[in-house]
Every structure is written in structure tokens, then in C-alpha cells.
Amino acid sequence: MTHQLRYVPLAAAMAFAALLAGCQKNAPAAAVEGADKINAYITCFNGVEQPIHESYQQYIGWMQDPEAGPTGKESGIHAPGTVLSHHVDECGTPMTAALAQTPAKPELDPVAKTYQERFTTLNERIGEAVRYYDREDYLRDDGKGMKALHAPLMQAYQAFFEAGEAMNTALEHNEDTRRQAQIDAIEKEEGRSASWYHLKIIGEGKQLVQVLDNDTPDLAAAQSQLARYQGLLEEAQKAKIGQGDAMWGHMERSADKLARESGRLVERIRTKTPLNKSEQMLLESGSMPPGGTRQAVLASYNDLIDMSNRMSH
């Protein structure tokens, strides 16, 4: 099994959206009622998903063949990375309490329960491995311990990754449904107000990222969604939405940045322009991603979500 480190930004939007649902008078009652439950699921997911992917990469990075496992003769041996204790705690009691909350969410609760269980199992396996490697027992047991730990640890990683994909899909679907219901309610009561544009920009931006975050993006679909997103931004600008509001201005600039980076990537796809050597090196360095890349689009989306979260406080 090999598993590539991936970005996990899309669920981040839901922390803002669920919070907004809880504080807006015109939010659908179901959205308000279930906000605490969803927030607990999101908090757990956002807290452990990325660290676990990084943990996995750290663990297999020094092995010649992760499928076969360690031989005990490698150099640069590392224990798997750990998850910060407060993030571990977020997937414990708060998650259990959320699972017990009513009304139940049949499409989401079983997925969340599996995610919690598999994270707990994996975290225990990681803890066992970390103690073994930190003691450097492999220097005295001819690597027998690392070989014994490897298969159960890799199985736990794989089970968690599968649960993570299911959790992300379930959270995304729940949020898409909730957001659209709220957008419809706001438009009915207020028209296309700042709140309406706020949620709409987040939703259309997310759709744009999803179209582009693919090894082989559909060019026509990407161009269509980019035009839709740009049209929404232009409509808000012409309506003078958020005029004079500094925080809206920050979010607006983040939204424009997402449009710009997405446009660059669409153009790269259209012209079939590969990354040049300097862009490839920049991408591999893990620093600021070069323009016209999936990573740059995702980073721009994360910035938009960050600005949206700040507006909600």
C-alpha cells in the first residue's frame, strides 16, 4: 500500500458554515439544531486528518519498499509522526457526545463512528511504534520488532485512510445540502444580501476547486465553473455588496485570488504547458506553490475559507 499525502481543505469551509447556521435568524431550523454535532465531527476531522497523512509519509519515507516493510538495515530511521494531544482529545469525548446527540443523522453518524474507531486504533498503533523507535530497540533486536510492528501499523493506516475518504465525502454532502437550503432561505427573506453572496461565493469556490483538483481535469467543466464563479464575483461587486466593510474587503480579495489562480491553472491545462524546472523545484520544496498549479488553487481556497471564518467571529 502506498498513499500520497493530499490536501484536505474542503471540509474546513463547513466550520464557518455550521457556525453561521447557528447564529443567523433565518437559518433553517434543522441546520441550527444539528450545528453542534456537525462542528464536533468537523473539529475531529480537521484536527487529525492532515497530521495522520504526514505521519504516514514520515514513517514510510526511509523505507526502500514500504509494502515489504523495514529490513532493519536502513539509515535515517524514523518513528511515525504523532498527532497533538488536544487533537486526539477532540476525537474522543466530544466526538462520542456528538454521536449520541439527537436528532440522529443516519447518513453521517455511522461514518463518523467508524472514523473515530479507526483513528483510535491507528493512534494506539502509532504510540506503540513511537515508543519502540524512540528506545532504538531495533539496534538490539536485529530489527525483529520493527518487522512485527509494520504490518498491523500499515493495516491501521489503510483502514483509517478509507474511513477518512468516506468521512470527507459524507461531510461534503451534508454541507452542500445544508448550504443550499440556507442560501434559498436567505434569498427568500432578504434577497441577494451580503449573507447570500457570502455563502454563494464559498459554495461556488468549492465547486471550482473540486473541478480542478484532479489529475486530468475536464477543461470544459473547469472553464464553465470558472466563468460561473467570476460572474458571481462581478455581480457582487456591481451590487456594491460589503462596501465599506473592511472584513468583506479581505474576503473579496481572497475570492479574487482564487479566481486568478484558477484562471492560471485553466490556461495551463488548455495550452498543455508543463511545469518548468524552477516551478517543479518550488513545488517540491513545500514552500509557496507556483502559480497555475493545483496546490496554488488549493492554497487560495484555504485563504478564502480563513477569511470567511474570521468574518463569522
Predicted features by range, described:
Residues 28-47, 104, 180-194, 293:
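Amphipathic alpha-helical segments and their boundaries
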